[in-house]
Amino acid sequence: KLAVYGCEVIFHKVCDDDPAGITAAILEAKAAGCGLIFTTGGMSVDPDDRTPLAIKNTGAEIITYGAPVLPGAMFLVSYLDGVPVCGLPGCVMYAKRTIFDLLLPRLLADDPITAEDIARLGEGGLCLNCEVCHWPNCGFGHC
C-alpha cells in the first residue's frame, strides 16, 4: 500500500510484545527521521496486546484509539512532536481495503487527522468486500 504512493521505508524493526521495547523502537524511528511511523500487531483489546500503551509511553498525543470503520476498528492515530504514529490493526495485512486506505493519503499530505474526522467515517465506514473492488468509486469511506 505504501509503494503505490512512492513511499520509502527507512526504518523497520521487529519487536516482542513488550511496551518498553516498542516505545524505544518508535522513538528510534523518529530519531532516524521517519515522517510517518506505523506499528503493526498488538492492537486488539486483548490484555496481552501492548502496542497502544507503548505508543502512549512515547509521549505522543493520542487522537483516537478505535474507529467506526470495518475493517479497521482498532486503528490508533497519534502525533509525536508533529510526526504521525499510527497503530495499524491486523486487517491492513490481509483485507483489500481498510481504514488505512482512507487515511494514508491524508497522512502523506500532512493533513492532520482529528477525532472528529475519524467519527465522520462512521457514515460509509463499512467495506462490503465486493468480489470486484471498485474503491474509491464506492461508498466505503464516503460520508
Question: Where do the protein language model's features map onto the residues?
Answer:
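Non-catalytic beta/alpha edge segments that cap or flank active sites
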Residues: K1-C143
